[in-house]
Amino acid sequence: MTPRRDPEGRRRAMLDVAAQEMIDNGWEALTHRRVAELAQVPLGATTYYFDSLDDLRTSALEIVVAQADEEIRQVAQAVHACAGSPEGLAALFMEYLSDRARLKAENLLYYAGVQQPELRPYAQRWIRGTTEMLSAYATPEAAQATALYLDGVILYTLLHDRPVDERALRMAIAALMGTSLPENQ
């Protein structure tokens, strides 16, 4: 008996490997040939499902965006649980910074937005989501300043292969959000 075809499963497999390839090796590394190789499908399948390389990239980025949106929801719950305290936020963000693949995925969204302006809304979602969740614990301006700082910390971590010092992170978050730390912090 011939195995049943699963066009949507095949398309999804190609998108999953395309997203991972861009995260691992950059926007430019993605080709129809590379996706076919990684997904173990004929080259013609990639051009059948995706009219152009831009179509493939954009569709794969939507996978990354969906994952980022889910992470934002999880982070929002954790921020709420720590009541937006600088100590809690710093601990939460240090955990976030420990996942290099996640940081690279976020950076991919920024790079995509720089390369193709129509993709900027994908990248802007993280900063907007972070600002919104922090606005419950600080002024809108302080929340935005903190979100922008945290964004810079992500780039620092990627460039230096290590996160910032947690104490320095706590102090910066407290200063930006206009709150104070306990004396021993």
Where are these regions (language model features)?
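Hydrophobic/aromatic-rich alpha-helical bundle segments in the mid-to-C-terminal region
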Residues: 119-120, 124, 128, 137-185
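Short alpha-helical scaffolding segments that buttress acidic/His motifs in well-ordered protein cores
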Residues: 92-93, 106-110, 146, 150-153
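Hydrophobic alpha-helical connector segments
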Residues: 70-103
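Short, basic, alpha-helical segments at the C-terminal edge of helix-turn-helix-like DNA-binding modules
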Residues: 62-67
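Helix-turn-helix
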Residues: 13, 17-55, 59
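N-terminal intrinsically disordered/low-complexity leader segments
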Residues: 1-9, 181-185
